Structures are given as C-alpha cells and as structure tokens.
Amino acid sequence: MRSGGRCNSIENYEKVCRISSGSFGNVYRVRRKTDNRVFALKRMNPSMCYDTNGFSILYIREVMILKHIRHRNIMEIEEVVEGCEINDFFIVMECCDTDLRSVIHSVGKIGMKAARFLTCQMLKGLKFLHGAGIVHRDLKPSNILLMRDGGLRIADFGLARAIESQMTNLVVTLWYRPIEILLGSETYDESIDMWSVGCVVGEMLRGEPILAGEGEMDQLDRIFRLLGYPTDADFEGLDLPHFKNIRRPSTFEASFEGDFECYGEEAASFVRNLLSFDPRKRCTASQGLCSGFVADAEECPGELVDIVGRCTGDI
C-alpha cells in the first residue's frame, strides 16, 4: 500500500501464466519485479466487484479476512494492487502448486495415508478459523490448495463471515451443502463447514464426489439414499421450514455402510459423524483432530508428494 492509502500498481508484477478462471475472477501466476518472488494474482471480475453501494462486500470480506488471519493452513494475502484501468483491482496471494479437485480428477482415489494427512491439515486450519469466530461457508476440493511438499492451504474466503445468529442460506456449493441449509435453516454455525469436510474426505477416499446432486431436491434425495431418512428426533429444536415438505421415499436402503466399510472403521465412523443430520452432533475441528482417523497423521507421506508433483500446474 502506498502512502496516502493508494494501492501499489500491477506494473510491479510480471505475468507468467493464467492459473485458473471463475465467475468471481481469473487467477494468474506472476513474478514481482523487485525481488523475483512468485505469487498468485487474482483479478477481481469488474462485473461482480461492485454493487449499488460501491465495492462488493464479497471482495472486502475476503481481503479483510485474509489480511488478518495468519495460519500455515490458510492462504495468505500479500497485498491488493490496482490495474491500469479505472476500478481494476487484483489480490496478490501466496502461490500454490495445485488444488485438491485437480488431484482427485487426475489420480482418482487418494491413498489412506495421504487422505489422513490432508484431513489433519484441513482441520488445523478450520480450528484456527473457527476459533477466530469465522465460518468459511464454501469448503470444497477446488478451494483446498496444495503445495509440492504436501502442504495444504484453505482458500477462497469470498463467502466467509463472522458467526452470527442469523445468516443467509444461499451458501456452500451444492454438493458440499449441509442438509440443514437445504432444508431452509438460517441459523447455523461452524458445523456447516464440518459437513463439507465430511464430503471432501469421502471424495478423497472414493475418488469422486459422494453427493453430486443436480439440484436441491436431487441433492436431498442423494443424501437420504446415502445416509437414510431423518426422523423428527434428528432435527428436534431446529427450525427447518422445508422439512415438512419432504416426502419420505417408499423403499430404499441407506448405502453408506456398504460404500465406506472397505476404508475401515475409523474412516467410516469419522465421515459418518461429520454427515450427522443434527449439526450439534458433528465433531468440531478440534475434536476431529483427536479422532482415530487423523491420529499420528502429522508426517507427509511420500505418495502425496509424488501425486502433487504430477499434478503441479493443473489449477
């Protein structure tokens, strides 16, 4: 940041290549001219940067969170720079090598040791984030970035916000969205992130999304077919306005046990707890770190380094 509150210029950076693109902006690999350090540079999509009140709250929120949260498993922001055009801004961030979505797409099932190690790092980042009173609200493989050494960074905080008593239910990418949000709850906490963790861990183990719905009703149907149909007791004390409109399927068998028993009791129990219908029964990030699934998962397995190396540059 320049004196007087002005941002530094994009001219301080040299573009290397485009890493990825999305509705909220493109991401480039860049090199800073003054010291040759490599960063990721996220261009803020001009059509989505601004609302009727000026600069979009999504971008303000992401910058503020990343500037004040410092943890080895959370993406770090270096600075915000301005482009050559009016209202053209970029976020300069730590540069990672690939993301979990690319890894799963490339190799399919991730080995148990690698899955446990990545889960451990994800929980550490969430423990810190939740301890600061912040919910991510959009955890998914494409927002989990990886380094060549197996290091993990939780990224994309555009939907993150401080925990409040009343929040919008238009959050979390559909496949990773918890059942209470699908059923209309506007009162939730960090437990929504833990459901998403369960979906991500299940995806690492199976090599494909475990709840890939094509719409909200199909998503609920897939949840019921995997986990069974919830009872009134599962949601006692919760305000879920859409639950009364859901028709109980006539006949079906929940497939979770058959789908996950091959991964062992610790893994199956861990994922099943995270996918509890009652959000109050899901383990916290801190409790998850004490579970048998991630116990002794502090050392990066060589297989993960090999996998990330093969996928480097795929984001």
Curated annotation (Swiss-Prot):
Classification via Pfam families: Pkinase
Cell compartments where the protein resides: Nucleus
Residues at the catalytic site: 138
Catalysis: reaction(s): L-seryl-[protein] + ATP = O-phospho-L-seryl-[protein] + ADP + H(+); L-threonyl-[protein] + ATP = O-phospho-L-threonyl-[protein] + ADP + H(+)
GO biological process, one term: regulation of mitotic cell cycle
GO MF terms held by the record: ATP binding; cyclin-dependent protein serine/threonine kinase activity; protein serine kinase activity
Physiological role: May play a role in the control of the eukaryotic cell cycle.
Family to which the UniProt record says this protein belongs: Belongs to the protein kinase superfamily. CMGC Ser/Thr protein kinase family. CDC2/CDKX subfamily.
Name this protein carries in UniProt: Probable cell division protein kinase ECU11_1290
Organism: Encephalitozoon cuniculi (strain GB-M1)
